Amino acid sequence: MSITAERKQELIKKFAIKEGDTGSPEVQVAILTERINNLTDHFKTNKKDNHSRRGLLTMVATRRKLLDYARSKSEARYTKLITELGIRR
């Protein structure tokens, strides 16, 4: 199941640095985390869906790169982000 527009707006509002911010690493990581969690649930019932699994691996790699960038810019914001999203790193 895809992420809904309402849920995406909630994530943007929660993690935005300033009004109208949709491109900061925090917002991008939050949206990717939501999509990754949805795909993880999808794989519990569709174990052989290898096409979507490749997309999942791409999303995880993108999220990891964004997290590395966020960490290089501000350790405090990075720590707050992974704590709020429940990501283990």
UniProtKB/Swiss-Prot annotation:
GO terms for cellular component: cytosolic small ribosomal subunit. One of its GO terms (molecular function) is rRNA binding. InterPro entries: Ribosomal_uS15, Ribosomal_uS15_bac-type, uS15_NS1_RNA-bd_sf. GO terms for biological process: translation. Pfam families: Ribosomal_S15 (PF00312). Keywords: Ribonucleoprotein, Ribosomal protein, RNA-binding, rRNA-binding. It comes from the Bacteria. HAMAP family: Ribosomal_uS15_B. PANTHER family: RIBOSOMAL PROTEIN S15, BACTERIAL AND ORGANELLAR (PTHR23321), SMALL RIBOSOMAL SUBUNIT PROTEIN US15M (PTHR23321:SF26). Belongs to the universal ribosomal protein uS15 family. One of the primary rRNA binding proteins, it binds directly to 16S rRNA where it helps nucleate assembly of the platform of the 30S subunit by binding and bridging several RNA helices of the 16S rRNA. Forms an intersubunit bridge (bridge B4) with the 23S rRNA of the 50S subunit in the ribosome. Part of the 30S ribosomal subunit. Forms a bridge to the 50S subunit in the 70S ribosome, contacting the 23S rRNA. This is Small ribosomal subunit protein uS15. It comes from Hyphomonas neptunium (strain ATCC 15444). The gene is rpsO.
